[in-house]
Swiss-Prot record:
It comes from the Eukaryota. Keywords: Amidation, Antibiotic, Antimicrobial, Disulfide bond, Secreted. The modification Alanine amide is found at A15. It comes from Halocynthia aurantium (Sea peach). Heterodimer with subunit A; disulfide-linked. Its main location: secreted. This is Halocidin subunit B. It is found in: Secreted. One of its GO terms (cellular component) is extracellular region. It holds the Pfam family Antimicrobial13. GO terms for biological process: defense response to bacterium. Antimicrobial activity against S.aureus and P.aeruginosa, possibly by attacking the bacterial cell membrane.
């Protein structure tokens, strides 16, 4: 769950 959240957060910030 944490890993998924980190990837999602990074993608959201980058996008």
């Amino acid at each position: 769950a944490l890993l998924h959240h980190g990837l999602n957060c990074a993608k959201g910030v980058l996008a």
